[in-house]
């Protein structure tokens, strides 16, 4: 018999390319499996396939997980400046002398979890 997995309150923020955001809270497994993350995240991405990005989140001042449409740039989705700042913050924390505009950007909607959820 399979053991029940522990569910914990989990907050996440959906950031649109227009800069608007919506905060959500759900109960999810403490260590969710890929399919659980996919079924939660991909609807926010307009059905796009999720791609994981480890980020240094300024809200938490700690490392956490962001998910974006893996084909966002190829689909020519609009640049998401708010998500790009979070994404680039990770690089700039380690390499402060780099030019941030030479780094990749986030295209389309992004989903940022306020706790680490990715085991990969």
What are these regions (language model features)?
Residues 4-39, 44-120:
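Detector for the mature cores of small, proteolytically processed
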């Amino acid at each position: 018999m399979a053991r029940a997995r522990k569910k914990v309150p989990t907050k996440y923020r959906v950031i649109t390319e227009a800069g608007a955001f919506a905060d959500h809270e759900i109960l999810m497994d403490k260590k969710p499996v890929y399919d659980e993350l996919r079924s939660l995240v991909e609807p926010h991405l307009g059905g796009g396939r999720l791609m994981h990005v480890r980020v240094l989140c300024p809200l938490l001042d700690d490392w956490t997980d962001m998910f974006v449409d893996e084909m966002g740039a190829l689909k020519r989705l609009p640049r998401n400046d708010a998500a790009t700042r979070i994404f680039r913050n990770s690089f700039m924390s380690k390499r402060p002398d780099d030019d941030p505009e030479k780094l990749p950007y986030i295209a389309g909607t992004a989903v940022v979890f306020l706790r680490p959820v990715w085991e990969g």
